[in-house]
Amino acid sequence: MQIETKLLSGALGAEIKGIDLTDVSDENFNKINSLLLEHKVIFFRDQPLTAEQHIALAEKFGPLETHAYVKGLENYPEIVRIIKAEDEKNQWGENWHSDVSYNFKPTKAVILKSIKIPPVGVETCFSNMELAWETLDKKIKDKIKDKKAVHSSLGAEFFLENYKKMEGNKKKKL
């Protein structure tokens, strides 16, 4: 089957059709990885992945991580289920947040599998920080380029240099 790519916005995002994620060949993984690096966020519909297939796909991107605060599945600690019962009051990620941004080395990819999505109240947004930096006014860039930010979750410091180290990143000069 031919791989189809549908752009979802000007800044980032593409829907990919024509790849079966249940058993990804090296050739198809290289295509997926290239599309991820190009579009920053990619979506695949109707992919009935088992936990084993989910892990196998994720491992192609590199060593897997476990969440620092949320326990994963018993046999698959790298997989975190986000479930909310109808009577549950707490909201997962209700306020703006950035997943695992406290890591010293940025996470290359996250694979989300949606099983049942409520009709309202579960918006997930993505941002292209590379494009944000590229389009930032030069005066602001000059003012902040040597600054650092401290993420209060674990006190990890994030330097612009860390982004340059991210595997597969071709834009080494920011």
Where are the regions a protein language model picked out?
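Non-heme Fe(II) oxygenase catalytic core, chiefly the N-lobe of the double-stranded beta-helix
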Residues: 1-174
